[in-house]
């Protein structure tokens, strides 16, 4: 398979009419959500949902690329593949997650998907690395074996962060069916050591207004406020990624919303994930899930004929203005890619 991938990559790069030059694309085959964005040992690491065998979503792996500037990326070997009993469901695999560093070790958190007696189960798991290139799955996976009581098995996309000496994890979940009549939730967990987690409550609840499932949640602090983002399934708004700004009581798991809005006015900005760059800025990258990637629109889009499908947004620096609007601008190195300027006026 490795030789076949190399041949496909050469064809895709040399003959690709649609191959992106401005946005990150997979070397070959299908990609979607960005995962595990982190600056570690002098390099930016970009992981992403990846199916190395097809231009269609299936059997999720974690693709991997590294960069010195978040613009020019070098493809690396696949970081995670579904090879354990708890993550080997053929229509699942190693779903989305995040990365943190602790004592020089890189921790990857991901959702493992398997099937038991015909029922799909989603659990939260760990893989670690001391060099950022080779990863070992934790022998006692999964570290969170089931969703909170009353939740469905749609329980995925852990985002881990540190606050006041403790580790926290937000995970997307729902009451009912994520596909049809569910009510989305963002769950909060707490840990002292990254291995043992305690459920604290829900940061955000849909209550019939914010979709049936809150995929790819994120939570980070900006200017003394806490920003919560997610990509709700079946949300009535056409724009697919939302943000909230407010205050957070971690001890009692009470999030008070002061502002809410769309993260992007387009329809192709899904599963955004944030991380801190080497200068301390908060940066976001998202999957550009334009409709041409989807099977019901021109099969899988013209890029599938070139052996690849999917791309990511350029990295965006995130800030809050005085009215707590979430403001984004391309990171500074993007300017080097612009060779011609065009100005539009109202």
Please name every model-derived segment.
Residues 274, 280-283, 305-307:
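Structured ligand/cofactor/substrate-binding pocket environments in proteins
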Residues 1-157, 161-209, 221-266, 286-345:
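Beta-rich carbohydrate-recognition and catalytic domains
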Residues 159, 272-273:
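A generic local secondary-structure boundary/capping motif
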Residues 210-214, 266-271:
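Repeat-based blade/solenoid architectures
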Residues 269-271, 279-281, 315:
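Active-site lining segments that contact anionic ligands and/or coordinate catalytic metals
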Residues 217:
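Active-site metal-binding loops of divalent metal-dependent hydrolases
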């Amino acid at each position: 398979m490795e030789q076949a991938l190399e041949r496909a990559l050469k064809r895709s790069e040399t003959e690709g009419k649609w191959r992106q030059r401005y946005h990150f694309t997979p070397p070959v085959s299908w990609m979607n959500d960005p995962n595990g964005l982190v600056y570690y040992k002098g390099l930016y690491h970009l992981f992403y949902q990846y199916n190395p065998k097809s231009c269609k979503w299936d059997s999720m792996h974690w693709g991997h690329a590294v960069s010195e500037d978040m613009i020019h990326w070098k493809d690396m070997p696949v970081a995670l593949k579904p090879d354990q009993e708890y993550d080997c469901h053929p229509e699942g695999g190693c779903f989305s997650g995040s990365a943190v560093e602790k004592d020089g070790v890189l921790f990857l958190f991901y959702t493992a998907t398997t099937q038991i007696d015909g029922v799909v189960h989603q659990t939260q798991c760990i893989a670690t690395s001391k060099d950022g290139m080779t990863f070992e799955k934790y022998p006692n996976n999964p570290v969170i074996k089931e969703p909170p009581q009353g939740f469905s098995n749609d329980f995925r996309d852990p985002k881990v962060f540190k606050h006041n000496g403790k580790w926290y994890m937000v995970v997307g979940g729902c009451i009912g069916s994520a596909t049809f009549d569910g009510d989305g939730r963002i769950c909060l967990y707490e840990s002292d050591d990254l291995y043992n987690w305690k459920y604290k409550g829900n940061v955000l609840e849909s209550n019939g207004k914010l979709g049936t499932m809150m995929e790819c949640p994120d939570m980070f602090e900006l200017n003394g406020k806490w920003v919560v983002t997610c990509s709700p399934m079946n949300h009535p708004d056409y724009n697919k990624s939302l943000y909230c700004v407010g205050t957070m009581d971690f001890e009692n798991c009470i999030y008070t919303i002061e502002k809410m809005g769309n993260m992007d006015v387009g329809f192709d900005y899904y599963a955004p994930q944030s991380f801190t760059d080497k200068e301390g800025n908060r940066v976001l990258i998202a999957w550009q899930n334009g409709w041409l990637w989807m099977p019901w629109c021109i099969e899988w889009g013209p890029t599938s004929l070139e052996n690849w499908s999917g791309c990511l947004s350029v990295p965006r620096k995130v800030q809050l203005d005085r009215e707590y609007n979430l403001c984004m601008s391309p990171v500074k190195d993007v300017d080097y890619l612009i060779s011609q300027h065009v100005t539009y006026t109202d």
